[in-house]
């Protein structure tokens, strides 16, 4: 009689294990179903830099609206200006946001404070996105947004592509790096942050003199010329008169750098908003750095 008793014991044990596996699987399925149900179904983005993320992470049918800047072409300030056509856009206000019946409003922290206060009073769910000051910040923010928007796999895919861009930039960057300055509309000289990181990865060492920057972050043309960089990247369009802010990029005094500095215009839209797509500018920086390194002698005439 011992054998049958042992058989029944094994049977009960096997059944317990099978039941445990079934319960585990069912719990996992329930969790996934809850996660899918919890993903926001009508997302409104109120700022250009949140548009960039929402468009990439949220299916079109779940995007209730992006900001008008996402598809603006006067000028183009978005990397998704063409791809996002057909999606509803708004000029963010309490009225325009509520008209889209959102179940989540994605805002950049600190932007449009009055709208933020009004939506909070009305109980509208808000996701505040912090500004990224480094590529490390980009990783944290992208992962967070992937979780909050129900798209963790998409977020990780974006970061994986960013890492591939970083590897490509490093592999082709000139060594030692080229001494360069990024001079932007109104005379702003980019210093620090993600732009500096992308430049460095691409083989450009930012030599804009911090001590010569004004309180507003602009660099006087005289200080720029005195720095005599190997590479001067003029951030924007080459055509004169496209906007008053671009006039300084055509300053006649910059002619003093001819023969010793490679000067080139470059549209760097991916750097306007920090995110994994910012690495798309690495190829532009790298190409300019290699050209500056291979250029003939730039000794002053």
Question: Over which residues does each language-model region extend?
Answer:
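Bacterial N-terminal signal peptides that target proteins for export
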Residues: 13-25
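Bacterial N-terminal signal peptides
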Residues: 23-33
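Boundary at the C-terminal end of the N-terminal hydrophobic targeting segment
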Residues: 35-40
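Basic- and aromatic-lined ligand-binding clefts that recognize polyanionic substrates
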Residues: 41-58, 154-204, 296-301
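A short, structured surface patch at a secondary-structure boundary
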Residues: 42-110, 114, 204-207
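His/Asp/Glu-enriched short active-site or ligand-binding loop at hydrolase and phosphoryl-transfer sites
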Residues: 67, 75, 194-216, 236, ...
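Short helix-initiation/N-cap motifs at beta->coil->alpha
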Residues: 85-95, 132, 212-221
């Amino acid at each position: 009689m011992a054998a049958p008793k042992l058989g029944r014991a094994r049977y009960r044990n096997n059944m317990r294990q099978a039941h445990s596996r079934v319960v585990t699987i069912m719990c996992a399925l329930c969790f996934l179903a809850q996660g899918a149900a919890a993903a926001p179904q009508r997302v409104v983005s109120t700022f250009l830099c949140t548009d960039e993320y929402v468009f990439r992470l949220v299916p079109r049918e779940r995007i209730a609206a992006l900001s008008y800047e996402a598809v603006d072409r006067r000028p183009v300030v978005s990397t998704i200006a063409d791809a996002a056509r057909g999606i509803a856009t708004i000029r963010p206000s309490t009225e325009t946001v509520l008209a889209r019946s959102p179940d989540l409003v994605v805002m950049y922290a600190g932007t449009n404070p009055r709208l933020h206060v009004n939506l909070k009073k009305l109980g509208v769910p808000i996701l505040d996105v912090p500004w990224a000051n480094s590529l490390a910040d980009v990783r944290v923010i992208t992962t967070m947004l992937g979780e909050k928007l129900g798209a963790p796999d998409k977020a990780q895919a974006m970061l994986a592509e960013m890492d591939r861009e970083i590897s490509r930039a490093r592999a082709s960057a000139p060594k030692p790096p080229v001494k360069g300055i990024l001079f932007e509309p109104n005379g702003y000289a980019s210093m620090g942050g993600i732009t500096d990181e992308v430049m460095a990865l691409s083989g450009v060492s930012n030599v804009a003199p911090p001590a010569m920057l004004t309180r507003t972050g602009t660099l006087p043309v005289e200080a720029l010329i005195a720095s005599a960089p190997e590479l001067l990247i003029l951030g924007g369009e080459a055509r004169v008169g496209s906007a008053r802010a671009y006039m300084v990029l055509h300053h006649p005094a910059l002619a003093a750098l001819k023969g010793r500095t490679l000067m080139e215009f470059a549209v760097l839209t991916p750097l306007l908003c920090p995110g994994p797509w910012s690495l798309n500018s690495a190829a532009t920086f790298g190409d300019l750095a290699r050209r500056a390194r291979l250029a003939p002698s730039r000794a002053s005439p």
